[in-house]
Amino acid sequence: METRETKPVIFLFPFPLQGHLNPMFQLANIFFNRGFSITVIHTEFNSPNSSNFPHFTFVSIPDSLSEPESYPDVIEILHDLNSKCVAPFGDCLKKLISEEPTAACVIVDALWYFTHDLTEKFNFPRIVLRTVNLSAFVAFSKFHVLREKGYLSLQETKADSPVPELPYLRMKDLPWFQTEDPRSGDKLQIGVMKSLKSSSGIIFNAIEDLETDQLDEARIEFPVPLFCIGPFHRYVSASSSSLLAHDMTCLSWLDKQATNSVIYASLGSIASIDESEFLEIAWGLRNSNQPFLWVVRPGLIHGKEWIEILPKGFIENLEGRGKIVKWAPQPEVLAHRATGGFLTHCGWNSTLEGICEAIPMICRPSFGDQRVNARYINDVWKIGLHLENKVERLVIENAVRTLMTSSEGEEIRKRIMPMKETVEQCLKLGGSSFRNLENLIAYILSF
């Protein structure tokens, strides 16, 4: 029987944002179940709950981060973390490598773009986890070309014009981040691309069979091994890596609802909306007359604690037809028989979880890869509806009714079923994700 001393050890360095923690810990569980020992290096900022993962070793590094509220946007937090973690991470990794005779590699989130210099210095394999799908990955990879051609400045004046280099996408879909200083976004793209191209390989929580053309294009651009082994959450029932407590009462509420009757609404863990949009969504959900489960995390609404701006009696007048929670166990909610639609920000984790359960989507993207995902959901895969203009209550109401009760919604539901079946096949013996995981494990053991 292998012990910690004889098992190959993988070090993991997740980026401390919810949408990045989840896939990294899912990946950690996959490797643990395949015989690897796992050591998680993490920042003090948004540090994970180690008690949820007693089978892993955790090592904390200082990040000296200021209060998150003091930063103008999340990109500045990202850059500051990359700057302040260089020395602590380097010291930590050097120590771990010297102490672990069976150390195999380190897997880092792509947003830790500073790590490539250190691992080259230590001559230690570094594999990168990219938490977007292949379509968004290819779009990000063309950043330098799109910048040179002036496309980024056309996102408002020619928003609906097609992007010749990226079939299906329009100027407004380009996955850039709105920042106080445009140079900050450029710095991020350049840093991430350089880090990816100098890595020992790239892992995707994606399905090769759904994006074969994009994978071929990515392989031309990136001369390193690429491994599509998603969906991560379907391999093992992982412990929670959520930074917020799940409100489990939503599952018992779903138990009382009719099959495929509930619209589930969640706009992710980072984006925020203004008071006006929040109220429009609230009235749109209410006026649709469909049962709804709505995740409103603290901080979702600019300047507000939670849902105190809802009109007096709003929740009471729903008479149990709607439920609002601060956070929910999303995979379980989407897998519930009562859930029939998903109003989503289109982050890739959420999009993939929706596809896995064949749940049609209403897309309300905010930034980054969410725009690419929304375009694919609406125009390429045709498995949802896209809210492209200002969010108004009538638009929300009509979208919910279309998705949940119309013949158009039924056609969408029929189109998403084969995608779910493709995902299920890819995980089986001989499937693309099964095969790619075997290749990835063999690759790591070859170092």
Swiss-Prot record:
Record-linked InterPro entries: UDP_glucos_trans (IPR002213), UDP_glycos_trans_CS (IPR035595)
Assigned keywords, A-Z: Glycosyltransferase, Plant defense, Transferase
Disruption phenotype: Reduced rosette size, early leaf senescence, enhanced resistance to the biotrophic pathogen Pseudomonas syringae, increased susceptibility toward necrotrophic Alternaria brassicicola and constitutively elevated salicylic acid (SA) levels.
GO BP annotation list: defense response; leaf senescence; response to oomycetes
GO molecular function (one): glucosyltransferase activity
Induction section of the entry: Induced by wounding and the bacterial pathogen Pseudomonas syringae pv. tomato (avirulent avrRpm1 strain).
Tissues showing expression: Expressed in roots, leaves, hydathodes, sepals and style.
Enzyme class (EC, first level): transferase
EC numbers for this chain: 2.4.1.-
PROSITE patterns (alphabetical): UDPGT
Keyword hit for Transferase: yes
Domain of life: Eukaryota
Chain positions recorded as UDP-alpha-D-glucose binding sites: 269, 327-328, 345-353, 367-370
SUPFAM superfamilies: UDP-Glycosyltransferase/glycogen phosphorylase
Function: Glycosylates the amino acid-related molecules isoleucic acid (2-hydroxy-3-methylpentanoic acid) and valic acid (2-hydroxy-3-methylbutyric acid). Acts as a negative regulator of salicylic acid (SA)-dependent plant defense in the absence of pathogens and promotes the jasmonate (JA) response. Negatively influences the onset of senescence.
Family from the record: Belongs to the UDP-glycosyltransferase family.
Protein name: UDP-glycosyltransferase 76B1
Source lineage: Eukaryota, Viridiplantae, Streptophyta, Embryophyta, Tracheophyta
